[in-house]
Amino acid sequence: MSDIEVSIAHALGDFRLEVVFTTPAKGVTALFGHSGSGKTSVLRAIAGLIRADHGTVKINGEVWQDDRHFVPTHKRPLGYVFQEASLFPHLSVRQNLEYGWRQIPADQRKINFDTAVELLGIGPLLERATSRLSGGERQRVAIARALLTSPKLLLMDEPLSALDHGAKQAILPYLESLHDEFDIPSLYVSHDPNEVARLADRLVLLEKGKVVTYGDAANLLTRVDLPIARYDDAASILEGYVSAHDPTFHLTWIGMHGGRVAVSREDMAVGKRARVEIQARDVSLSLKAHSDTSIINMLPARVVDTQEINPSQLIVRLELDDGQTLLSRITRRSAMGMGLHEGMRLYAQVKSVALIA
């Protein structure tokens, strides 16, 4: 069975962890929640860094822990990337990478050294001392080192949390490429909705040590009854395909049933599948399709649900013609002026779209 199965109960002082979820052992599953929700503790239990008082951790049918059996961390085939890169300070970048890689028998290495170096863009850093790396460079090296141990599971504990906004934006494309290139399932801890939207296939929502819900990320991101939809950076993920390129205005059109959106020109073949991220704050609503506006992205939609965020704002869940869902954040005044109600047909005006893959 190709699943990650977790069912653990553990006391950490006054904090009680009671977590149960099952997720496919492929792609990226994000563990999301506020600080103190138990995300890192779950990851540490899966890694064997803490031994849960009770429960089971099973990866692809292989039991790593149950009430009678416990596999120590060093015998679990996993890679772990911490919030701050834990590199050996006395070794160069190359030596850090080779440390774990050389411990794997050559016939068991699933990832080529040069491939990992190229994918993470760290070729120019190989002979550099780790003390001379920026925060973003250190994390890329740490990720490459984890990959080169040929893990069956990659655990990433808020790997971007210590980076500034610019460094985060620089490293996200590497993480996106990583999960496209290698068939290694990942559990990714984050409290940033933008990271989750860009990287996750599935989502486990945690609150006060318990699982609120888990499932498909695109669906859960747009559930207005869940706290993630109320974050300032709340976003939706839409899937489509490259429908056309506009060389005059350097745009690429991403088509979906019933509409299309434009992104900055990308060198992608027409017909190729694509995913885009749309921030809820970048989606306004209109009763009519307008041509006398600077907004060129308009998608016909139906109002599914609304939820008050604060006394002045609402979050609106929309369903597009192809069944995909989209969030919009608008003022209560605007909603009242439009006569907004469940089932209403209208147009979503999308100011900005980010291509993910």
Q: Which ranges hold each PLM region?
A:
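A short, proline-enriched helix->beta-strand linker immediately N-terminal to the Walker B motif
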Residues: 148-152
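Conserved ABC ATPase "signature" region
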Residues: 62-67, 108-125, 176-177
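Catalytic Walker B motif of ABC-type/P-loop ATPase nucleotide-binding domains
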Residues: 154-158
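Glycine/charge-rich catalytic "coupling/switch" loops of P-loop NTPases
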Residues: 258-307, 324, 332-357
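Conserved ABC ATPase signature
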Residues: 129-133, 137
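Internal alpha/beta loop-helix hairpins
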Residues: 180, 190-259
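ABC ATPase NBD coupling module
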Residues: 63-79, 103
